Structures are given as C-alpha cells and as structure tokens.
Amino acid sequence: FLDTPGIHKAKNKLGEYMVNVAEHTLNEVDVILWLVEPSNFIGAGEQHIIEQLKKVKTPVILIINKVDTVDREKIVEYIDTYRKVYDFAEIIPASALRAKNLDTVIDMIFKYLPYGPQFYDEDTVTDQPERAIVAEIIREKALHALDDEIPHGIAVYIDRMKGRKGQNIIDIDATIVCERDSHKGIIIGKGGAMLKKIGSNARYEIERLLDTKVNLKLWVKVKKDWRDSDFLIKNFGYNKDEI
C-alpha cells in the first residue's frame, strides 16, 4: 500500500513536492483507490484529479466514505454523479468509522492485483528506515496534541539515535521545526507542558516499535518559511530528485 499525499493546490514548494509525489505514483501501482466524501458536487479539485486519472491505464476504485452520515437515496445520487465523469472500475460506498464495506474494499483490491513474486517477508510491515519512522511518529503526535493551534508546517528530524552499550535502551535526540516564533511557544507550551506531552506520547509508540526502552529528548527550532526552501525541504527527507 502506498498512502500518497492528497492532491491539492500547492501554496509552497513542499506542497508542490507532495502533489508531484501523488501524481507520479499513479503510474507505479496496480490499482488506485480514490477516497472522497459523500457529495454530488465535483469542483475544480476533483476535476483536476479526474484529468490525472485519465492519463493512466491503472484501474481506479472510487470509495465514497462517511456514507453513515447521509441517506441511502443520496448515496445512489452521488454514485451516479461520479459515474458520469469517469469510468471507475468499482464504486464502493463505505464508512471507515463504522467499518461498513471495508471487507468489500479489500476484496476489490485483491481482484485487481496481479500475481507476482513476494518482495518482502511476511513479518515485514514497512521498507522505511527506523529513523524516518521515528521522526514521523513524533510529528504525528505533535499534530495530534496541537490539534488546530498551528498549521501543519512542522517537520521533525532525528539528530541522534544510538543504543547504549550493554543496556536495553536507545537514546534519541530529535528537533521539531516550525516556521514562526509564535508557533515555537505553542509547541513548547506553558512550562514545557505541551512538549512533554508530545514526547511522552511519542516515546510510548517508539518503544512499541523498537521493542526497547527509549530516552527521548526533544528540541524546538524556528526555520522561517522552511516549506519554501529547497535546501531545508531536502534535508527533512523530501527529495524531489527521488520522485
């Protein structure tokens, strides 16, 4: 499974990178899942995605999520609307929250997957390096803890990650990068409470991932407008040359 960034109108260089990743991925997979909310309105954003889908021969499964929030008659109307604008391989109304039709989604994925060699062992869950996963866990916990207090313009990089000799513990030093001084204060919180919360939540999940004790230390730095800096974007692991 490749969970691509959402296709959107980019407002900075990082956004452009994310959109390029999503659009390039369309040619590299065996089946595409397009997740939409229940609506019969197809705006410029949706139309742009449809135009991108027309450029590839990959089968596309449209998943209309959150159908538990609308009447059954409306669902039929939404399906008809999307059928008129693109020849989808399948259209599946579903609800991730209520686990409605999720089995059908999985079955349809297998229907369109070709047989091929097993590239990874059965117990392999990802091909990403541990440092990248740890950084993403910290960023995820930060975004959850901060909710809507700051934009998603934060990044995390791992300064140091090393196991202690003869001990079942790993020391991890990481930096949370934001774009504004005001954001730094919010991330740290009163008396460091917010940063402590982020660290505690991240540490718990990292310990589960690595199956060892973790000593996690977090710092917060301001890099003004880093999302428009090619150098910083690349340093944070978003390398456009690898798309």
Model feature map: region roles:
Residues 13-24, 41-44, 48, 70-77, ...:
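Charged, alpha-helix-enriched surfaces in structured cytosolic catalytic cores
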